[in-house]
């Protein structure tokens, strides 16, 4: 919707009564009905970040439903949701839980839904957490009328945070097939509403745009393609994120040593760290989680994720083929945990289990891996042969044989992505660029036709599908979470349950390797990573 499709109605009296000020209304009758409007607005009430990117979430503290004829409460839910305990979090009247009301002159309007929500901003050290009453009201005399009202739990404009309009109440009304927005201004602030350039007026315009867009979307059958918060509770994740962001973001952004955008990488890795910490509490138990497991971040890149996890008390290592400039900014206890090594999975170097049974003394499989060298000192390209025995002994090679309590992280780990479910440890992998087990670029197709229609058949979706397929084949019971990170490549595939874990490497893994040609190019490709420039995702 544009200014041509919305009328600025500030000169008109509000249908809601003398306390209210009309702001905007649709120029033409809307083509959706009350059910579409209410479904959309109930979602906006629960997901206020739809209206403002400054908002992180809403905690629904009170959820009441009323019978329109009798006015009696037919459903009542109250939740005590704890807030983070970090010092410096700003709060305004968050102990005020009594639902509020405002005068309404519209005839026969009664409350259908009544909520008290706590709005949590992304940065509660800058913007205050507040409580707000949300009402959905219907008319007993006009079945097509619906009114949504927002009332903050404070009476002073100076207490109003940046992320909501600075008014005493907001009303969004569907009546006579027109959609309109109305305010009750704070004392002495009514004149501001007569200037369309004022932020509070521009906000009214956007609120009406959102209400129209989402109501129309419901009517047109819009369905969310992405579901968040499937594996880890949203509140636990977001509170952990707020805590970590406050603790680490300034140091990391101020001391960024890479050429890439620090804010994108820092805040993305803070979110991934928050998710992992809450995931590990779920898997290993919330008590003493740091003593029950350790991690290996394969393809750790700039090391931000490792830095945060180690500083939070977790034991682990970050491994990458190339050291990054950022490694130099971390304290000594973190630097010691960042290793410049290439990953060559031991399944490529060790004897097959059947061979090992007949010759228990064997430590390597006797394979040789060719690699071409080009140098000005050579009269022609030369081929070097690496033996499995030499690679097993090389300090520059990590063969991914870790302690049993290891959890593997693959955060946009490119060539390693498809390998991670095959290594025999619980894991979380966030796919990015598509490579096969030889380290060559490849495009996988989504296997299921119906799934491809629903999710798309992009290179990325094909890679995600491939990782899930490989994990399933070797016995992992996987879960998938669409992470709340600033990246379109945000699918996390998680596996921590596998009845065959003590049998790795299984026959199925060798079958997969045979199907991919033995992964013969892996050694050469991974060695080349040591010479190439780091990628910035």
Curated annotation (Swiss-Prot):
One of its GO terms (molecular function) is tRNA(Ser) (uridine(44)-2'-O-)-methyltransferase activity. Its EC number is 2.1.1.211. It comes from Kluyveromyces lactis (strain ATCC 8585 / CBS 2359 / DSM 70799 / NBRC 1267 / NRRL Y-1140 / WM37) (Yeast). InterPro entries: tRNA_uracil_MeTrfase (IPR011671). Belongs to the TRM44 family. GO terms for cellular component: cytoplasm. It holds the Pfam family AdoMet_MTase. It is found in: Cytoplasm. Probable adenosyl-L-methionine (AdoMet)-dependent tRNA (uracil-O(2)-)-methyltransferase. It catalyses: uridine(44) in tRNA(Ser) + S-adenosyl-L-methionine = 2'-O-methyluridine(44) in tRNA(Ser) + S-adenosyl-L-homocysteine + H(+). The keyword tRNA processing applies. One of its GO terms (biological process) is tRNA methylation. Its main location: cytoplasm. This is tRNA (uracil-O(2)-)-methyltransferase. Transmembrane segments: none annotated. Keywords: Cytoplasm, Methyltransferase, S-adenosyl-L-methionine, Transferase, tRNA processing.
């Amino acid at each position: 919707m544009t200014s041509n499709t919305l009328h600025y109605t500030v000169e008109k009296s509000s249908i809601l009564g003398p306390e209210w000020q009309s702001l905007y209304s649709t120029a033409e009758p809307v083509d959706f009905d009350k059910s579409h409007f209410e479904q959309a607005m109930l979602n906006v009430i629960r997901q206020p970040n739809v209206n403002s990117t400054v908002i992180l979430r809403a905690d629904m503290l009170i959820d009441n439903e009323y019978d329109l004829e009798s006015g009696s409460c037919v459903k009542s839910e109250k939740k005590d949701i704890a807030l983070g305990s970090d010092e410096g979090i700003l709060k305004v009247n968050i102990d005020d839980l009594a639902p509020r009301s405002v005068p309404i002159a519209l005839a026969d309007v009664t409350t259908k839904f009544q909520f008290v929500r706590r709005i949590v901003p992304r940065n509660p050290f800058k913007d205050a957490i507040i409580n707000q009453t949300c009402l959905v009201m219907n008319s007993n005399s006009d079945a097509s009328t619906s009114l949504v009202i927002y009332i903050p739990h404070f009476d002073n404009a100076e207490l109003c945070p940046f992320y909501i309009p600075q008014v005493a109440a907001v009303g969004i009304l569907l009546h006579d097939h027109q959609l309109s927005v109305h305010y009750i201004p704070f004392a002495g602030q009514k004149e501001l509403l007569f200037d369309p350039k004022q932020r509070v007026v521009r906000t009214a315009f956007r609120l009406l745009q959102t209400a129209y867009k989402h109501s129309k979307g419901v009517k047109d059958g819009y369905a969310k393609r992405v579901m968040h918060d499937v594996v880890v509770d949203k509140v636990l994740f977001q509170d952990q994120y707020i805590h970590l962001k406050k603790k680490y973001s300034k140091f990391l952004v101020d001391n960024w040593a890479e050429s890439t955008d620090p804010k994108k990488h820092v805040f993305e890795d803070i979110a991934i760290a928050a998710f992992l910490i809450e995931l590990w509490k779920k898997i290993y138990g919330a008590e003493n989680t740091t003593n029950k497991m350790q991690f290996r971040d394969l393809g750790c890149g700039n090391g931000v994720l490792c830095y945060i996890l180690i500083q939070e008390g977790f034991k682990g290592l970050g491994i990458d083929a190339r050291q990054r400039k950022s490694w130099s900014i971390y304290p000594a206890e973190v630097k010691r945990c960042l290793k410049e090594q290439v990953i060559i999975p031991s399944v490529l170097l060790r004897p097959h289990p059947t061979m090992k049974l007949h010759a228990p003394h064997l430590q390597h499989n006797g394979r040789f891996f060719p690699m071409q060298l080009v140098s000005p000192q050579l009269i022609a390209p030369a081929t070097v042969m690496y033996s499995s025995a030499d690679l097993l002994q090389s300090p520059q090679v990590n063969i991914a044989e870790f302690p049993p309590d290891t959890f593997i992280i693959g955060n946009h780990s490119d060539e390693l992505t498809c390998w991670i479910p095959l290594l025999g440890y619980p894991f979380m992998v966030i796919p990015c660029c598509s490579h096969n087990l030889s380290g060559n670029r490849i495009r996988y197709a989504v296997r299921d036709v119906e799934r491809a229609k629903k999710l798309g058949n992009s290179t990325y979706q094909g890679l995600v599908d491939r990782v899930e397929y490989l994990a399933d084949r070797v016995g992992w019971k996987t879960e998938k979470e669409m992470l709340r990170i600033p990246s379109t490549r945000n699918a996390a595939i998680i596996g921590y349950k596998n009845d065959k874990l003590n049998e790795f490497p299984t026959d199925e893994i060798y079958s997969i390797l045979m199907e991919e040609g033995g992964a013969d190019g892996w050694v050469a490709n991974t060695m080349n990573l040591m010479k190439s420039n780091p990628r910035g995702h």
